[in-house]
């Protein structure tokens, strides 16, 4: 009888521990999604404010640029489209999100200090890093030898109020990448929850 009670105690304790770990994991995912949603909204607002300040002729000229423009982060391997995102593992989505955020560490300094974007990105990167460690659980990280995409060096040298084209590209790419990360983290969060429907 005593042995049965001991076994039951161990089982109950392990269940509580497992449930606690699940709740903590969900809390971390929720926090990461909220943070990237805020950054995406911030990027959209900055883009809107930038476009509103343009003259009609400037707006018309710039609207033709971005669809043909290359973003620095395009060199980062990432799921393309809904189907590929759905098929990607949680670890792959987290790793891709981490690299996208990391690629903005230096360029974000050109996006304006009032909103503390660099600090927000650093916090999000740290949170995603914790989630990756939780998913790895002793495994080796994937793509360890991936080299980070080169920074937006041309933007650093020429970005100014007078250089509308590069300002527009930088803001457009930032908004595009924050949308990607928001999508990847939302799918990863859903996969780690009890929700069986994680369609986009």
UniProtKB/Swiss-Prot annotation:
Check the record and name the InterPro entries matching this protein.
Answer: 4_helix_cytokine-like_core, Somatotropin, Somatotropin/Prolactin, Somatotropin_CS
Q: Does the keyword Disulfide bond apply?
A: yes
> Where does the record say this protein resides?
Secreted
Write the record's keywords in alphabetical order, separated by commas.
Disulfide bond, Hormone, Metal-binding, Secreted, Signal, Zinc
Which residue pairs form cystines in this protein? 71-173, 190-198
One record GO biological process: response to L-arginine
Q: Which positions make up the signal peptide?
A: 1-22
For this chain, one GO molecular function annotation is:
metal ion binding
Q: At which positions is Zn(2+) bound?
A: 38, 182
Gene3D superfamilies cross-referenced by the UniProt entry: 1.20.1250.10
From which domain of life does this come? Eukaryota
Q: Any one cellular component term from GO for this entry? A: extracellular space
Q: Which family is this sequence assigned to?
A: Belongs to the somatotropin/prolactin family.
* Function recorded in the entry: Growth hormone plays an important role in growth control and is involved in the regulation of several anabolic processes. Implicated as an osmoregulatory substance important for seawater adaptation.
- Fetch the PANTHER family from UniProt: SOMATOTROPIN, SOMATOTROPIN,PROLACTIN
* Protein's name in the database: Somatotropin
Q: Which organism is it from?
A: Pangasius pangasius (Yellowtail catfish)
């Amino acid at each position: 009888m005593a042995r049965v009670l001991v076994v039951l105690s161990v089982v109950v304790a392990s269940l509580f521990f497992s449930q606690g770990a699940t709740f903590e994991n969900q809390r971390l995912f929720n926090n990461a999604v909220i943070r990237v949603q805020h950054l995406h909204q911030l990027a959209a607002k900055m883009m809107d404010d930038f476009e509103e300040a343009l003259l009609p002729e400037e707006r018309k000229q710039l609207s033709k640029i971005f669809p043909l423009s290359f973003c620095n982060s395009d060199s980062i391997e990432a799921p393309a489209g809904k189907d590929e995102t759905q098929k990607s593992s949680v670890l792959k989505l987290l790793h891709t999100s981490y690299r996208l955020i990391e690629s903005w560490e230096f360029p974000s300094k050109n996006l304006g200090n009032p909103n503390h974007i660099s600090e927000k990105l650093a916090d999000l990167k740290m949170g995603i890093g914790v989630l990756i460690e939780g998913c790895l659980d002793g495994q080796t990280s994937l793509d360890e030898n991936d080299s980070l995409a080169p920074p937006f060096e041309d933007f650093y040298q020429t970005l100014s109020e007078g250089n509308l084209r590069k300002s527009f590209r930088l803001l457009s790419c930032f908004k595009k990448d924050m949308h990607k990360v928001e999508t990847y983290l939302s799918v990863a969060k859903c996969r780690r929850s009890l929700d069986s429907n994680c369609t986009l």
